[in-house]
């Protein structure tokens, strides 16, 4: 398992440098890896209200960007690490409920890192599903041909 925790800014800045070169190098060496994306840790910020948080839109953008890089390189994003809870917390900003910095204090229950709440986690799952459907590398015929 090869997990990348870059942060949105790094992924965008290095989209055409870091990750593609890494993918090409691993492929060239013939090493089999499972590429895993960690969009949480690199996108942790301090909110204007002083809470440690993660902007949901940055998490989503990083996931989409990682999928795009893998698509361009003929590779697969095979795993995703997210911190989430089934509780209705307000620890990460954004999402369908548009949690703002001002909302964070209402249900901020984490003892360590901010987690996606259940709605944000489901929203992310559907967005990932859409990315997989768009990506021809993940089609049944492509997977069958690769095996």
Task: Give the location of each predicted region.
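Single conserved hydrophobic/aromatic residue that forms the stacking wall/gate
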Residues: 1-8, 12
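Catalytic-face loop-and-helix region of soluble metabolic enzyme cores
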Residues: 10-133
